Amino acid sequence: PNPTIDNVKHGVETFKKSGADYLIAIGGGSSMDTSKAIGIIIANPEFEDVRSLEGTAPTKNPCVPIIAVPTTAGTAAEVTINYVITDVERKRKFVCVDPHDMPIIAVVDPDMMSSMPKGLTASTGMDALTHAIEGYTTKAAWEMTDMFHLKAIELISKSLRGAVANTKEGREGMALGQYIAGMGFSNVGLGIAHSMAHTLGAVYDTPHGVA
């Protein structure tokens, strides 16, 4: 499910009660985005409401250390500086961009993705491919990001069908391809396809890769 404001509030409360020193985000983009929001608010308590972090977040402190373990090959949230939260009441998604939310460790292991059903593998894979294409065609693109995005397009194009069939080579190619795409678009942004997907996801609670 798409991460909500209430998910973040509950996570902040739970973290405070636990006395933990760091966060381990295991899952897809929703789990990692929720962890980023929790970690930022814990480290910057003046921002109690995650909605106040929309846009380029004005935080001063790095978030609580996050170890990200993606179980899908799509969002690349383990290597990006943004997170997306859903405002259920207003039926909208908002993006928070903050270099302080980058996980300190990313464990990108294709074996952790091998239990994904075919539909989820396909939809998250298309999200990764869209990242690479939009990142390559955005006006902010330059030589270094072109290198990332073109390689990601190559890997994903060769690997997605194999990943849906749950082959070892397909899973490995998708794990690397989506990661490289994240390294690229995190520097230059995305395009209108993602803007439309955020709207559809917020109104209909559609999974991001499908929207």
Q: How should these model regions be labeled?
A:
Residues 1-5:
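Short beta->alpha junction loops
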Residues 6-111:
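Glycine/threonine-rich beta-strand-loop-alpha-helix active-site module
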Residues 8, 32, 126, 150-153, ...:
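Short alpha-helical patches at coil-to-helix transitions and adjacent helical residues
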Residues 11, 34-39, 132-133, 156-159, ...:
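Buried hydrophobic packing segments
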Residues 41-45, 135, 203:
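Active-site catalytic microenvironments for nucleophilic, acid-base chemistry
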Residues 82-188:
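Carboxylate- and glycine-rich phosphate/diphosphate-binding segment that chelates Mg2+/Mn2+
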Residues 188-211:
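C-terminal catalytic subdomain
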